[in-house]
């Protein structure tokens, strides 16, 4: 699974038991757990998507600034989403390192930039808006 931050996560079976390996940095671990592990457990135990713990809801946001993507990986940059009369807007403004737990407090969403794609100011992209 090629995502940033979050690499490389491990997902598989060992002796008929599921195994998950999470990255060491807190932001990476949180995103991998929310996007991969929680949905897997929910599907195994028959928990509906509405009842399942998840990262948030997928929305479309207009970028207020350029956002760099990641080569060959889905890129989840932390963003601050605001709701205005014209729609939803997203801004990045803090250090994006995967060890920067503070960024998870001051931001309320992440970009979903496809591999090898940067987000340009004024562009509308998909994002997750945290619950």
Show which residues each predicted segment covers.
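Flexible glycine/proline-rich
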Residues: 1-131
